Amino acid sequence: MAKAKFERTKPHVNIGTIGHVDHGKTTTTAAITLVLSKVGKASFKKYDEIDAAPEERERGITINTAHVEYETDNRHYAHVDCPGHADYIKNMITGAAQMDGAILVVSAADGPMPQTREHILLARQVGVPYIVVWLNKADMVDDPELMELVEMEVRELLSSYEFPGDDIPIVAGSGLKALECGCGKRECEWCGKIWALMDEVDKYIPTPERATDKPFLMPVEDVFTITGRGTVATGRVERGTIKVGEEVEIVGLAESTRKTVVTGVEMFRKLLDFAQAGDNIGTLLRGVERKDIERGQVLAKPGSIKPHTKFTAEVYVLSKEEGGRHTPFFNGYRPQFYFRTTDVTGFIELPEGVEMCMPGDNIKMTIELGKTIAIEEGLRFAIREGGRTVGAGVVTGIIE
C-alpha cells in the first residue's frame, strides 16, 4: 500500500463512508470531490474511478478499497470507500483503514437497512468514535413527514448502539443531484448540501490525538547484549515518545511486569536524547539481563497498558479463496494468536448457541491465551495456523 506524501499544513483526519449497499456511498464520495474541486481543494473522482477500487492485501486478506483525498478550509482528509459489504467488514476489523470518524450514508427513500445496522455495530465494536449522517436520495422524498420519520429511525438506531443519536448531525441531500448540477456553489440547492455535510464533518469529528501525544509503547522485536553496556531491546516506537533517563515497564509473557530505566536510545547507529512514534530504535535498559526480556513483550510508559490473557474480539475468518481454512472450526479451537511481534497459543469460545464458524464469516468470540500479552481495546491481531493467517481480529473488551 503506497502512502503518498502530502503537504501537512492542516490537521489530518481519516474518514470513510459506511452504510447499506446501493444507498449511495460512492456517489456521495464522488460528489464531495466534485464540489471541493470547484474551490481547488480536491481533484474530482468520478463514480467509476472510485468504484473500480484496487485490491490491497492487509495481513494476507484481500480488500478492495478506494482512497480519495481532499481538503476543507480547516483540514486535510483521507477518505476510504469500499465497493463491497465484505470489504467494509474486513477493513474495519483489520484496521487497514483506521477511521477517526465516518459518514453514515442512509437512503432517505428506504431508511435504515440490515447493513446500516451492521456497519453501526462494527463502528461501535472496532472503535470508530464519531459518526455524521448523510440522508442521501432526498430528491426522491416529497413528504417532509417521511423525512422526519427516517431521521428519527436513524437516531434511534444509533442510540441503540451507544452512539449519541440525539446529538449526531444529520444532513439531507442528494449526491446524484449534486453530481448532475456540478456548480459547486454553497447557495446551490444540491451542491450546498454537500457543503453543509462537510461543515458538519469539520465541526463534529474532532482532530485525533497524534500518535506522539499518546503514552509511550514499543513492541520488542529483538534483544541483544552489548558487552560492558548491558541489554538492548530494538523495535519501532508505536506511539508516544521516550527520553533517555525515563522509566518504562516490560509488559507481557512474564509472571509479573518489571520496571527499568532507558539509559540510552540509538537510531541508525547514532545516539539520541529521545525517540518518537515511527522511529526504529534500540533502547539500552538498566539492570535488565538478556533472559529478562524477549520478542513479543512491549516497553511501555508505566501503568499505561496491562498484561491480560482473556478478552472478547470481533474476528473475520478468511475464506478458502483468500488462503484461509477449507473447513469450519468449532468451540475450543486452538490456533496461534499473533500480537504485534509474536505468536501465542490460545483457545476460542464461540458465542452461546453458535456451534461452528465457517471460512468467510465475521463473528464475536472470547479468546483465552496461554500466556499474558499487553492488550487493550482496539488492538489488532492475526489468527494463524502453522504459520499461515486464517483470521484477523480486533480486541473489543478485556475480561482478565
Swiss-Prot record:
Q: Where is this region: G4?
A: 136-139
CDD domains on file: EF_Tu, EFTU_II, EFTU_III
Looking at the record, the residues that make up the tr-type G domain are 10-209
Give the function comment from the record: GTP hydrolase that promotes the GTP-dependent binding of aminoacyl-tRNA to the A-site of ribosomes during protein biosynthesis.
A GO cellular component annotation here is: cytosol
Region (G3) residue spans: 81-84
Q: Matching NCBIfam families, A to Z?
A: EF-Tu, PRK00049.1, PRK12735.1, PRK12736.1, small_GTP
Record's superkingdom? Bacteria
What segment(s) does the record annotate as region G1? 19-26
Alphabetical keyword list? Cytoplasm, Elongation factor, GTP-binding, Hydrolase, Magnesium, Metal-binding, Nucleotide-binding, Protein biosynthesis
| Species per Swiss-Prot/TrEMBL record | Heliobacterium modesticaldum (strain ATCC 51547 / Ice1)
- Quaternary assembly: Monomer.
Which segments carry the region annotation G2? 60-64
* Name recorded for this polypeptide: Elongation factor Tu
The Enzyme Commission number assigned here is 3.6.5.3
Q: Which reaction does it catalyse?
A: GTP + H2O = GDP + phosphate + H(+)
What molecular function terms (GO) are annotated for this protein? GTP binding; GTPase activity; translation elongation factor activity
EC primary class:
hydrolase
Q: Which residues bind GTP?
A: 19-26, 81-85, 136-139
Localization per record: Cytoplasm
**What does the sequence similarity comment in the record state about its family?**
Belongs to the TRAFAC class translation factor GTPase superfamily. Classic translation factor GTPase family. EF-Tu/EF-1A subfamily.
Record region (G5)? 174-176
Lipid metabolism among keywords? no
The residues that hold Mg(2+) are: 26
> Matching InterPro entries, A to Z?
EF-Tu_GTP-bd, EF-Tu_GTPase, EFTu-like_2, EFTU_2, G_TR_CS, P-loop_NTPase, Small_GTP-bd, T_Tr_GTP-bd_dom
